Amino acid sequence: MSVIRIKTNATVVAVLPASEDQADYPSTFFEGGNEIRLYVNKEEKLDVLRQYVYMGLVEKNCKIQHVNAYLYAVLKGERELLEADWDSFGHKIGIRGEKIGPFNLVRVEDIPDGLPDGKLNAEVSAEDDAWLPLFLLGLYRVGRASETAYRTLLMESLIKQCKAIKSDWVSPVTATHKYFDVWGNDGNYLKIVACVDMFYNHFKKSIKATFRWGTIVSRFKDCAALATLGHVVKITGLTIEEVFTWVLQTEVAEELVKMMKPGQEIDNSSSYMPYLIDMGISAKSPYSTIKNPSFHFWGQLVAALCRSKRALNARQPDEIDSMSISNASLLMAYALGSSPDIEQQFSTGDTYRKPPKEASYLVSEEPKSRSVVEWIAWYSDVDNKPTDDMLMMAKRVAGTISGPRDNSVGKWIKQTYG
């Protein structure tokens, strides 16, 4: 984009510094047959790795290289039978009738440099392979939790999972330990986590699917804007197409269009797509709230005004057109609340028949349907401003909110309409 300097008639190119990385769509990674690569030490014996990891947990200095090598060694033999061909983004994972394992999802390459030294413990045996992988994968979920009470709750749940396998087991780790938090910075550990979750998400009936307790947070990581869309569909009872028609604000629409880029396998439950971050497919998710702040705020505000408690805790993004988005959200929530989709579904013989709808020439009269066209026409007739009834509805919602989190949608509603 350029402008003209009036005094000199010179052309000036108007640019701003690049403030952030561009989002990477998952399909882009696989162009040209690119493969996901996992690097682990494949040479050390499982018995030795098991002891290294166990003693590392006991002494609170467990090395991530040992963890990765152990998880690969103990899980590489797991096999499940494919009932149908499995492929994603043109990459053939397996064919019908084939037995495959978690690491068929990636190309595994050996790290030839060897492993750091570790300590041995002869009392650790193959029996510990029943709980140790679950525990190591579970620490990923615990390590992502920053809030103390929630972290403690997760650790207690993980310990219960392991005790269900070995009743006399005593955890060598507590929620107060932090050394394993940094494992989430290791790309190979993240790929192992993603492989396990993607594999057992596909084979949900497997006895080892319990390993997903810790890995499930890898699925749709940094895809919160997609979760927002799903929540709006659920809380409003509209179809996804109907939700789209209620998007009345430009920035929200533009972000939604970017999220809906074709060919990304969003609706394929067995795709690599949900693991775009931990598999290393995308450095920056196009489905995050950071990339879609206006849509995220719009969707969560609609849900909150429709009395969703979960939406109240959603983060309030900075530097967006909050008031314009708020008005659009309020109109949608008010319209849905004023025209509930209620009609007789079953009958013992008597059925209510709706009388024919009488034509009305008064646009200022509130619509009785959920038609977005009728509501936009009505809103235009009231000068495109929230009416007293709309504001009263929002005020009632604000009145139900107590102690909202700072910088949350609930806080915004309380301050704006309370």
UniProtKB/Swiss-Prot annotation:
Main location: virion
Source domain of life: Viruses
GO molecular function, one term: RNA binding
ATP-binding in keyword set: no
Ribonucleoprotein in keyword set: yes
One Gene Ontology term, aspect cellular component: ribonucleoprotein complex
Cellular compartment(s): Virion; Host cytoplasm
Pfam families for this protein: Rhabdo_ncap (PF00945)
Quaternary context: Homomultimerizes to form the nucleocapsid. Binds to viral genomic RNA. N in nucleocapsid binds the P protein and thereby positions the polymerase on the template. Interaction of N(0) with the P protein prevents the uncontrolled aggregation of N(0).
Role, per record: Encapsidates the genome, protecting it from nucleases. The encapsidated genomic RNA is termed the NC and serves as template for transcription and replication. Nucleocapsid assembly is concomitant with replication, therefore viral replication depends on the intracellular concentration of free N, termed N(0). All replicative products are resistant to nucleases.
Name of the protein described by the UniProt record: Nucleoprotein
Organism listed in the record: Spring viremia of carp virus (Rhabdovirus carpia)
Phylogenetic lineage: Viruses, Riboviria, Orthornavirae, Negarnaviricota, Haploviricotina
Gene assigned in the entry: N
